Each structure stands twice: as C-alpha cells, then as structure tokens.
Amino acid sequence: MNARTTAGVATMLGSAASNQIGAAVGAHAFPFIGPAGVVAVRQVVAAAVLLPLARPDVRRFTWPQWWPTLLLAVVFATMNLSLYTAIDRIGLGLAVTLEFLGPLAVALAGSRTRLDLLCAVIACLGVYVLVLPGSSSDFLGIGLGLLAATCWAAYIVLNRVAGARLPGLQAPAVATSISAVLYLPVLLTLHHGGLGYALIAGLLSSAVPYAADLIVLRFVPPRLFGVFMSVHPVFAALAGVALLGQVLHVHHWAGIALVVMANALAVRSSRPRDERTIDAGRTLEGRAIAGG
C-alpha cells in the first residue's frame, strides 16, 4: 500500500474504533435514560451534522421523492432502537455482529456463485455459533439484533431509490431529521442524568465516523473500504469487554470471526459494477446517519 492508502486504512480503523467506543459510552447512559433516550439524543446529533451539509429544500420535494425518504425515517428510528435495546440485552459485540448480517444479505442477494453461497453458509454457521440457542438464550435480544440487520438491509435498498431521486445527502438528512422528531416525546421526558454519555455517544458514533468516511473514500478503493467495514463487530466486542465489562466466551469470538470472514469475502468477491452500490449504502449509513 502507498502512503495515501495507508493513511486511509488508519482513518478507517480509527473511525470504526470511534463508532464502537461511542456505542459503549452510550450504553453507560442506559440506566438513566434507557436505550430510547440514547437513540433520541443520537438522532438529534446526526441531524445536526447532516442538515447543514445537505441543505435540502423540502418545499420542492415531490411524492416520488418523499415516500422513500419517509420510509428511511421509519427505518432509521427502528434500526437504532432495536440495535441499542439489543446491546442492552445481549451485549455490544453480539448485537453489532447480528446487525452486520443486513448488508451481508444485500451483498449476497441474487448471487449464484459458489463463493457467495459459501459466504452465506459461513454467516449462518457464525450466527449459530455466536448465539448457541439454549434455554438461557435471550431470544428477544437476538431477535432485536436481527431486526436491526433487517432495517440496515432495508436502508441500503431504500437509499438506492432515494439517491436516484434526490441529489447528495438530502434524503438521509431529511429522514434523520424526521426520525429525530419522532423521538421528541422521549427527549421531552429525559432528565439530565446520563445526557453527557448520550451526547458523547452521538459525537463519537455519528459526527466522527461520518467525517472520517468522507475523507477515507478519497484515498482507498470502495472494495477495500467494504472489507475494512468488517472490523466493526470485532471492535464492538473489544469495546464491550474493555468499557462495559462484558464477558465473551470462546464461541462468541468464533461466531464473530465467522461473520466477519463471510462479510469480507462477500465484499472482495463482489463484481466491480456492484461495488459502488453496495459500499455507498454502507458509507452513507456512514456509521453516522443511524446504525451503530
């Protein structure tokens, strides 16, 4: 790798670390304001970052532009709440790993190659090893993690539609703002305890990764960016252990490794014409607009 690519890789790793450290910091606010409170604050921070950049003129939006934007708002609101509630129930590393099945499913959708089939098998095996279903399993937490994955997949598909009808970041900016408005009832009932944690989480998981992603794509190819996105579950697990005192057993690490492997292989094997579409969805979601 040349110096520019090396700098880009370092920035990507820093962005991933910031994102997951932010999620861990946000978890410290759960006892005070709950997952919904953290999500509410984070959505406000994300909207504050995106609106000045996109500067959308909503008065000129047509219905074909509005409907995917409104659906994006619902997806953002649901994805965040399901992810952060899953983090509260099953831990950061497990929740983020399950969430990553969403973009993986989109990357593999419609594929017929043997390698992509292998990726799907590895991912399914990874999830089974990760959760090892049993009488003590938190199936609600697992279900919420999978709901977050479904929302992320829906985001990628909807963003393709909205991106074809609205230039730049207008659709995500408006959708994030609407999502923040949906959480106004939660914001109005929050007390001051834990707000500092939530604000720091919003900055580390929204503003910093978003700015980093914009810089990174100037230095590294989209496919390399997609591969390095695969480190998020690992960083999430490490942040959970270091900052939240969460305990991960051997089967957890094995499951995370399998999902990361499947995701990286899927991105590396994607056809060149698919690169921009797949990775644009991940980038714009930016680990900044909505998901953890």
Regions found by a protein language model. Give the residues of each.
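Specific alpha-helical transmembrane segments that line the substrate/conduction pathway
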Residues: G37-A47, F76, Y84-R114, A148, ...
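Transmembrane alpha-helices of multi-pass small-molecule transport proteins
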Residues: V25, P31-T78, L101-V106, C151-L158, ...
